[in-house]
Amino acid sequence: MRYALLILCLMMVGPVTYAAKIKTTEELVHAMQKKYGKSWYKTATFVQKTTEHEKDGTLKVSTWYEALAVPGSLRIDFTPVKDGNGILFTDNKIYVFKNGKVDSNRPFVHPLMILGFDIYRLSQGDALEKLKGLKFDLSMLREDKWQGRSVYVVGAKQGDLRSLQFWIDKKNLYFVRMIRPTGKDGAQTQETQFNKYQRLGGGWMAPEVIFTVDGKTVTTEEYSDMRADVALDSKLFDPQYFGTVHWKE
């Protein structure tokens, strides 16, 4: 009798487990935050080799030093650092620096920061609002395959590789791909890939980032010397100190 009851209970578990599968973007964000919300690093630094693919076929290679404060801030110092040139993303703005001084700034929410990093350190409500503000259609979620792995796709139907959308690895719940229209009247398609993920602190980081337009690679980024939960001066992310405070000389 007990054995029969046990079998019956196990049979009942099947439908419950199936019902618990992720079926909405809200559930996906919740799962991502539940998995990493307490462990994901709050700061990180890395050295980036940036390769720009010029139209004439030549390659322009440069080194950037980058520092993250999650959520919300990313600092990029172009080499040589002493020249004071770079970019700062903070407080939903982008600042461009030349010779240590602000050359321009404007409102900007960085989609790759939100999807790749900030989503784990924002509240669920704030994360969803950011994604809505970026114009992703959160009502659309499906499953697909990418590079041999199962993924969730938010924002586009099966076979649509034009509309604004982002892809999340199903097992590890990290961001792997974004597609969006670009160029005049959205006639071109831009794709961003986060590849070759490695464990970093209590989270992950993709040491290879590829940007393409209409299937042609335009920029690649290769990260090295990746470090998590680094002690960083808050002034690193304050525009008024960009020219005087650095994490890497």
Which residue stretches match the model-derived regions?
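Gly/Pro-enriched, hydrophobic low-complexity segments
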Residues: 83, 147-239
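Short structured motifs
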Residues: 31-33, 61-62, 123, 137-140, ...
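Short amphipathic beta-strand/extended segments with alternating polar/hydrophobic composition
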Residues: 61-64, 86-91, 103-113, 168, ...
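Sec/Tat signal peptide C-region and signal peptidase I cleavage site
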Residues: 15-19
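Flexible, processing/modification-adjacent segments and terminal tails
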Residues: 20-30, 40, 95-162, 182-188, ...
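Sec-dependent N-terminal signal peptides
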Residues: 4-12
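N-terminal mature ectodomain segment of secretory-pathway/periplasmic proteins
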Residues: 20-101, 139
